[in-house]
């Protein structure tokens, strides 16, 4: 028989630690005194340790032969201070000294030159399968160590019982090769393993674990019954109780009892045919395994997976969890009613099922256990992780946050509200949950207790710091020491990857590949792919963007060209112009900014490219431009690049494409991309070019299929602000009309309004002078009613409905996210654009709805570019006029809700200072009316301007503030400014002079010279804010006011650029060149172009600059943010007609900065 005493009485040398400072452990150099309070046998804490609770009794030095009396020395303290590691809390300054780590079992994964602390499942925390029993000589010392630890946990030594148990375990191992834990030992081991778990933040409850001993079960059915008992006990109608069920221990590794599920309760994740995932993406692989084993999928978002149980090493069996055992919590928010519409829920019981309990050399591969949720586990990880349900962006949109701007911190705001909803929902249902702040504080208390009681606390900082709130939780500032003690809960390899199937017919069809084989296959495939890509023609795709739209399309283009080429997508500011000499194929996707300029990240390339004189490499190229046809310089930057590359000798692969944001931009891009791709395949003679399968994005069906849409009645009342916030990712608030005043005289045939809006609260939303107010208008009731009268088979106009679409495989319906549930009347009034002429794509779909063949053919003809442009420019029809022109169209409500474009907000420069009028926002609005067909057509109205003009006092106005960081007053108020703004271009300058007036009168701050250049037709007709300008000049806010009149009788027309040339040449030089001042231009884009041309002429003359130098001079002004432009497109049809040759807009109702 092996001698147990060699493991019980190990000779140890003690090293003296000369540390002199005391710490919170309060145990350096002190003797151990066990607590005097008795603990009864029934107390759940009867195995709670004293100071050395996790340590085995101190061994005696000397010979093996000893008397039982000498065992009393097992509890004696060491003769000197033990070695320790000092850790510090950087928030409180408190230090701990860890000695418990000397009892650590084995090494962690860290190496001298690398740290593996952030690895999810490191090898050091994972135990794999076995194919034979643990050898007795390995098992015995671990068993004795555990027995020592167990008996060392009692308040009073039980020496005789201790020795007897050591003898019994030793004999049992020698006889059978293993041993069995007693019931009390099992309880102690499971609790101690929880206590030792470094990644658990809730260990303060470790001694309250309920242990269910299921070591006697032998079948999967018995396992299922034990698990049902566990779930029922732990759930406890929502008052969650921590529990563990322990199945038989591992013998030879071939008869394991295992739960194949990662958790007892988890939701299925289905890989859909279109590549999307329905349900929980984390469980896709396991869900497919269940399906392969015979489970019938339900294809819902929250389907509880069956239990997959393996008994005695046999093939696993499936068991459906009785629904009454699964307590689920529906999610709602205490303030946001729409949160219920997300239709979220979560199960109440977090029960980990796939870990292994190691104790005394024994392994229990089946030991499901549970605690209760910390809110962030659900609210952050389950709902917000990109690889999980990923609801963050949808919530951000519904909250009205700016989800397109990371710097707006929309993610942080949204994730907090999601966690508020989770906590609120659990608490409302009386289901146990703990917020992460309370959890962190409880862990700090637990950690302090552990250091006092046993001199250490293994802790993994990466796992314990909650996924939100970071440094405002105390655990963030706490240094931690991570190590593995025994007993311990280890990770395991997924059982389906290692299971030896007894019935090959039940083996899942999709066999797993061994990791080494997989690595080799991946490496080999990557080598082949690298060689294949290297042999392909290289294609460089450049983009320049202000909003990110061009980048998105460039990435889509890269996906298309990767089917046959070796593409690389780059931003223009990352591209080295010298690489043009090496290019084979260059593709450019870019927007145009301002007055025909490049976006900011394209300026560098533009300047270098325009200066390039020659190119020896003759490559192929193609360009696609994005923009708005409301601007005369539509896609100008794209055409500039095209022209320059052609001049340098490059060969155009395909005509330059144009994407108009007002008219089917995406359709235009897809068409151009496919045309360009095919041309490239032909030009470079790509192998198999006629059989290449291109991405689905470029092959989507452009026809209307009514079977894919349906309307469902909905009772949810419409909250307009919340709906608009969600749809447009803006923070929409309500202002109310205070007053409106016509700024033009009664002699004028036009109307320009000063619209004063008052806030509903005590103070208007925050904004700065020069920023914009986005306004959500309503469509005219006459247009809405006219369309409603022509809808076929539609619901009642005021019946709330929601649009649902059929998934691609046709197995279920999903709620369309484009529009909120609302009535058809509300959709046409608030959400859908019914005044912009239909795109060619929409006309093609309408052609399917025509019952008269002649009308159908006419609609199909209008889909051709030449016919379409003529029809659109001449008629500029609203959707109602299209229905009137083609009366045989049978348009359904689902067609309207799914196919009409979204009504966009209209932007107006704010004409007031928040400091001067803190409860108001003022706008300057030109009211637009016109007739099409050379004045012979129907009367059209600007959508937003006409709506604003029709409002009555206290009527609501949904709106939001849009920042304009490039058009604000100088930070140094002493800098001189020149303000140029004819017509409604005066709007932001009114906010400028009001701000300066407030600073002068209330703060005593004087600003630099401010010169205003205004333009209008006649002084007695349309000189906007004339009296206010005079008042500002009298008070010294405006130092000079110059007005250009363009319609004085018997006088030549004078424009603002003429004033600059004739009166202010010297002032321009002083402000821009000598005094480092600022110049602001606001108004029509053609005016801004003429002003820029005049200013360049003035500066070139004054500074003797050539054309290239003056361009660079103004480029530098813009870079220094001293030349500011806030411009909008021409919106009046007679202006369009007059300047049609210059490429002015064909859509007269496109939103401008101040007119719509």
From Swiss-Prot:
GO biological process: arginine catabolic process; defense response to bacterium; inflammatory response; negative regulation of blood pressure; nitric oxide biosynthetic process; nitric oxide mediated signal transduction; peptidyl-cysteine S-nitrosylation; positive regulation of interleukin-6 production
Binding site for FMN: 545-547, 549-550, 591-592, 628, 635, 661, 665
Protein name: Nitric oxide synthase, inducible
Residue ranges occupied by any FAD-binding FR-type domain in the UniProt entry: 730-970
Location, primary (coarse class): cytoplasm
Gene: NOS2
Cofactor: record remark: Binds 1 FAD. Binds 1 FMN.
Cofactor (UniProt): heme b; FAD; FMN; (6R)-L-erythro-5,6,7,8-tetrahydrobiopterin
Binding site for heme b: 200, 491
Binding annotation for Zn(2+): 110, 115
InterPro entries: CysJ-like_FAD-binding (IPR003097), FAD-bd_FR_type (IPR017927), Flavdoxin-like (IPR001094), Flavodoxin/NO_synth (IPR008254), Flavoprot_Pyr_Nucl_cyt_Rdtase (IPR001709), Flavoprotein-like_sf (IPR029039), FNR_nucleotide-bd (IPR039261), NADPH_Cyt_P450_Rdtase_alpha (IPR023173)
Residues annotated as binding L-arginine: 263, 372-373, 377
Subcellular location: Cytoplasm, Cytosol
Positions that bind FAD: 772, 906, 908-909, 924, 926, 930, 943-945
Inhibition and activation profile: Regulated by calcium/calmodulin.
Entry-annotated residues carrying Phosphotyrosine: 575
Family per similarity comment: Belongs to the NOS family.
Sequence segments annotated as region (Calmodulin-binding): 515-535
Function (record text): Produces nitric oxide (NO) which is a messenger molecule with diverse functions throughout the body. In macrophages, NO mediates tumoricidal and bactericidal actions. Also has nitrosylase activity and mediates cysteine S-nitrosylation of cytoplasmic target proteins such PTGS2/COX2. As component of the iNOS-S100A8/9 transnitrosylase complex involved in the selective inflammatory stimulus-dependent S-nitrosylation of GAPDH implicated in regulation of the GAIT complex activity and probably multiple targets including ANXA5, EZR, MSN and VIM.
Catalysed transformations (reactions): 2 L-arginine + 3 NADPH + 4 O2 + H(+) = 2 L-citrulline + 2 nitric oxide + 3 NADP(+) + 4 H2O
Organism: Bos taurus (Bovine)
Cellular component GO terms held in the UniProt record: cytosol; nucleus; plasma membrane
GO molecular function list: calmodulin binding; flavin adenine dinucleotide binding; FMN binding; heme binding; metal ion binding; NADP binding; nitric-oxide synthase activity
């Amino acid at each position: 028989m092996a001698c147990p005493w060699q493991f019980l009485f190990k000779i140890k040398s003690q090293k003296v630690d000369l540390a002199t400072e005391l710490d919170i452990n309060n145990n350096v150099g002190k003797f151990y005194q066990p607590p005097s309070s008795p603990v009864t046998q029934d107390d759940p804490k009867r195995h709670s340790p004293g100071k050395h609770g996790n340590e085995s009794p101190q061994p005696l030095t000397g010979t093996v032969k000893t008397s039982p009396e000498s065992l009393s020395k097992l509890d004696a303290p060491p003769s000197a201070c033990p070695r320790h590691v000092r850790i510090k809390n950087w928030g409180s300054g408190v230090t701990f000294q860890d000695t418990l780590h000397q009892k650590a079992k084995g090494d962690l994964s860290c190496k001298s030159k690398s740290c593996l602390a952030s690895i999810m499942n490191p090898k050091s925390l994972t135990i794999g399968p076995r194919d034979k029993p643990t050898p007795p000589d390995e098992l015995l010392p671990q068993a004795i160590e555990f027995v020592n630890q167990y008996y060392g946990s009692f308040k009073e030594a039980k020496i005789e019982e201790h020795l007897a148990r050591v003898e019994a375990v030793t004999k049992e191992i020698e006889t059978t090769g293993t041993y069995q834990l007693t019931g009390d030992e099992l309880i102690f081991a499971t609790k101690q393993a929880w206590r030792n778990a470094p990644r658990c933040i809730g260990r303060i409850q470790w001694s309250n674990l309920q242990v269910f001993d299921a070591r006697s079960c032998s079948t999967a059915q018995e396992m299922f019954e034990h698990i049902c008992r566990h779930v029922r006990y732990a759930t406890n109608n929502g008052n969650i109780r921590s529990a563990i069920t322990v199945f038989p221990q591992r013998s030879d590794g071939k008869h394991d009892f295992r739960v194949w599920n990662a958790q007892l309760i988890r939701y299925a994740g289905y890989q859909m045919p279109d590549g999307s995932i329905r349900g929980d993406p984390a469980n896709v692989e396991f869900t497919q395994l269940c399906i392969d084993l015979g489970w019938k999928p339900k294809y819902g978002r929250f389907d509880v997976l069956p239990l997959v149980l393996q008994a005695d090493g046999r093939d696993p069996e499936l068991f459906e969890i009785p629904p009454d055992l699964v307590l689920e919590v529906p999610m709602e928010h205490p303030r946001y009613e729409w949160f219920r519409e997300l239709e979220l829920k979560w199960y109440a019981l977090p029960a980990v099922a796939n870990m292994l309990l190691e104790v005394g050399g024994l392994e229990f591969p089946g030991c499901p256990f549970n605690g209760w949720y910390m809110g962030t586990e659900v609210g952050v990880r389950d709902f917000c992780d990109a690889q999980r349900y990923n609801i963050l962006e949808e919530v951000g949109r519904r909250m009205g946050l700016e989800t397109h701007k990371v710097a707006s911190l929309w993610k942080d705001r949204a994730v907090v509200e999601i966690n508020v909803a989770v906590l609120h929902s659990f608490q409302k249902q009386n289901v146990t949950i703990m917020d992460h702040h309370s959890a962190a504080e409880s862990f700090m208390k637990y950690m302090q207790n552990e250091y006092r009681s046993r001199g250490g606390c293994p802790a993994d900082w990466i796992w314990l710091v909650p996924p939100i709130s970071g440094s405002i939780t105390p655990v963030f500032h706490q240094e931690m020491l991570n190590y593995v003690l025994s007993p311990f809960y280890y990770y395991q390899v997924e059982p389906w990857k290692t299971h030896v199937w007894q019935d090959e017919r039940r083996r899942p069809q999709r066999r797993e590949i061994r990791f080494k084989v997989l690595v080799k296959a991946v490496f080999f495939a990557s080598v082949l792919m690298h060689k294949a890509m290297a042999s392909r023609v290289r294609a460089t795709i450049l983009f320049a963007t202000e909003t990110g739209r061009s980048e998105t399309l460039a990435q889509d283009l890269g996906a298309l060209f990767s089917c046959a080429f070796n593409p690389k997508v780059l931003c223009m500011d990352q591209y080295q112009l010298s690489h043009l000499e090496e290019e084979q194929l260059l593709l450019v996707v870019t927007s145009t900014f301002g007055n025909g300029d490049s976006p900011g990240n394209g300026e560098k390339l533009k300047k270098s490219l325009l200066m390039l004189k020659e190119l020896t490499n003759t490559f192929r190229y193609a360009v696609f431009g994005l923009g708005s046809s409301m601007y005369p310089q539509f896609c100008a930057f794209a055409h500039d690049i095209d022209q320059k590359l052609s001049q340098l000798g490059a060969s155009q692969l395909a005509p330059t494409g144009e994407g108009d944001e007002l008219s089917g931009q995406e359709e235009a891009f897809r068409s151009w991309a496919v045309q360009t791709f095919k041309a490239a395949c032909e030009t470079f003679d790509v192998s198999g070019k006629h059989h290449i399968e291109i991405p689905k994005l470029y092959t989507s069906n452009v026809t209307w299929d009514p079977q894919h849409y349906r309307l469902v009645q909905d009772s949810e009342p419409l909250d307009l602000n919340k709906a608009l916030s969600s749809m447009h990712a803006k923070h929409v608030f309500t202002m109310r009309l205070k007053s409106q005043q016509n700024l033009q005289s009664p002699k004028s045939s036009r109307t320009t309004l000063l619209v004063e809006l008052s806030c509903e609260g005590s103070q208007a939303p925050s904004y700065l002078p020069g920023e914009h107010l986005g306004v959500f208008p309503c469509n005219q009731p006459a247009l809405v009613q006219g369309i409603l009268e022509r809808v076929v088979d539609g619901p009642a106009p005021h019946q709330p409905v929601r649009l649902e679409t059929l998934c691609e495989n046709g197995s279920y319906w999903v709620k369309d996210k484009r529009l909120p549930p609302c009535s058809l009347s509300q959709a046409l009034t608030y959400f859908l654009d019914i005044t912009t002429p239909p795109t060619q794509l929409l006309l093609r779909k309408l052609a399917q709805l025509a019952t008269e063949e002649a009308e159908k053919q006419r609609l199909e003809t209008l889909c051709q570019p030449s016919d379409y442009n003529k029809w659109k420019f001449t008629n500029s029809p609203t959707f109602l006029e299209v229905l009137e022109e083609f009366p045989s169209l049978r348009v359904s409500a689902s067609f309207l809700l799914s196919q009409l474009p979204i009504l966009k907000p209209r932007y107006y420069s704010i004409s007031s200072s928040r400091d001067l009028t803190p409860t108001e926002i003022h706008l300057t609005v030109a009211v637009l009316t016109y007739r099409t067909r050379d004045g012979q057509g129907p009367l059209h109205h600007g959508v937003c301007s006409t709506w604003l003009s029709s409002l009555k006092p206290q009527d609501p106005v949904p709106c939001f503030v849009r920042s304009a960081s490039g058009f604000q007053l100088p930070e140094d108020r002493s800098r001189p400014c020149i303000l140029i703004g004819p017509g409604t271009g005066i709007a932001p300058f009114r906010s400028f002079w009001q701000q300066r007036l407030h600073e002068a009168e209330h703060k005593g701050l004087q600003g630099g010279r401010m010169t205003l250049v205004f333009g209008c037709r006649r002084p007695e007709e349309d000189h906007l804010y004339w009296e206010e300008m005079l008042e500002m000049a009298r008070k010294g806010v405006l130092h000079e006011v110059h007005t250009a009149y363009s319609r004085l009788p018997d006088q030549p027309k004078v424009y603002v650029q003429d004033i600059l040339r004739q009166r202010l040449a010297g002032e321009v030089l002083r402000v821009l060149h000598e005094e480092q001042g600022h110049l602001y231009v606001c108004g029509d884009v053609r005016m801004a172009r003429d002003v820029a041309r005049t200013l360049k002429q003035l500066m070139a003359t004054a500074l003797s600059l050539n054309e290239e130098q003056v361009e660079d001079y103004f480029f530098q002004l813009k870079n220094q943010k001293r030349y500011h432009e806030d411009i909008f497109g021409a919106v009046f049809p007679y202006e369009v007609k007059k300047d049609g040759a210059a490429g002015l807009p064909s859509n007269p109702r496109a939103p401008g900065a101040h007119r719509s």
